[in-house]
Design a protein with these regions (language model features):
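Catalytic glycan-binding domains that act on GlcNAc-containing polysaccharides
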Residues: 1-142
Length: 142
């Protein structure tokens, strides 16, 4: 979906929800790909404006993956395909990442983050990139 490889999508699903389709976070993010209502409503206006979808529909795996993959695609597109920077944006929001990119101590080129200064962001990005790397090693040659 949205030209995303299945290993990358699986890394996000594993990190976000542990493959639990009815996962709900402490900030009420929902589903396999853990999306907040604000993000869901924004994305719904872009890809499903004519569909009768509610926030609770993110508990449906197909809906969660569809919306989560679209959002991940937008993050990767915005941050030039850099998985770590896109993961930081998926987790913490574009505004946070855009602000960090303007700081030389966090980005040499203003386009990719060199480090992740917030502990939750750093932990999240490390989980995504480690899981994605492990999947790539496991499935290399398949």
């Amino acid at each position: 979906t949205y030209n995303l490889g299945p290993l990358l999508v699986d890394a996000f699903i594993r990190t976000e929800s542990g493959f639990d389709p009815v996962a709900t976070s402490s900030v009420d993010a929902r589903g396999l790909m853990q999306m907040t209502e604000e993000t869901f409503l924004w994305l719904r206006s872009k890809i499903a404006a004519d569909e009768d979808l509610a926030f609770a529909d993110l508990y449906d795996p197909d809906t969660s993956i569809r919306f989560g993959c679209y959002y991940l695609h937008l993050c990767l597109e915005r941050y030039n395909g850099d998985v770590a920077t896109a993961a930081a944006a998926y987790h913490s929001g574009w505004g946070t990442v855009d602000n960090l990119l303007r700081m030389e101590e966090h980005s040499a080129d203003g386009q990719t983050l060199q480090g992740f200064p917030y502990s939750q962001m750093n932990h999240y990005v490390n989980k995504i990139t480690s899981c994605y790397g492990a999947y790539q090693r496991i499935y290399a040659g398949n």
